[in-house]
């Protein structure tokens, strides 16, 4: 097989992303493939500003922030055993996984 696999992880909780990346790296290294990463990608922050009051007091506002954390993992010289191990791997439900071969 021996192809490059790129895995992108995305979540709103940085602990989930880090634990999932560590789990993937451990699994891939156990199969004998070469791993590059996890590489932290820039954090995307969305800030929402809303009025505290519904009618008056425009100067009184509140801000909310939604941060998304991303990690990138590259796998080189993968085998069929590596792909099978990745398919059987269970990750938390709050993590979005994108795999490119």
Swiss-Prot record:
Which key words are in the record?
A: Ribonucleoprotein, Ribosomal protein
Under the heading SUPFAM superfamilies, the entry gives:
Ribosomal protein S10 (SSF54999)
- InterPro entries per the UniProt record, alphabetical: Ribosomal_uS10, Ribosomal_uS10_CS, Ribosomal_uS10_dom, Ribosomal_uS10_dom_sf
**GO molecular function annotations of the record:** structural constituent of ribosome; tRNA binding
GO CC term, one of those recorded:
ribosome
Which GO biological process annotations does it have?
A: translation
Q: Out of the domains of life, which is the source?
A: Bacteria
Subunit organization: Part of the 30S ribosomal subunit.
Per the entry, what this protein does is:
Involved in the binding of tRNA to the ribosomes.
Family, according to the entry, reads as follows: Belongs to the universal ribosomal protein uS10 family.
Q: What is this protein called?
A: Small ribosomal subunit protein uS10
What's the source species for this entry?
Bacteroides fragilis (strain ATCC 25285 / DSM 2151 / CCUG 4856 / JCM 11019 / LMG 10263 / NCTC 9343 / Onslow / VPI 2553 / EN-2)
The organism that produces this protein has a lineage beginning with: Bacteria, Pseudomonadati, Bacteroidota, Bacteroidia, Bacteroidales
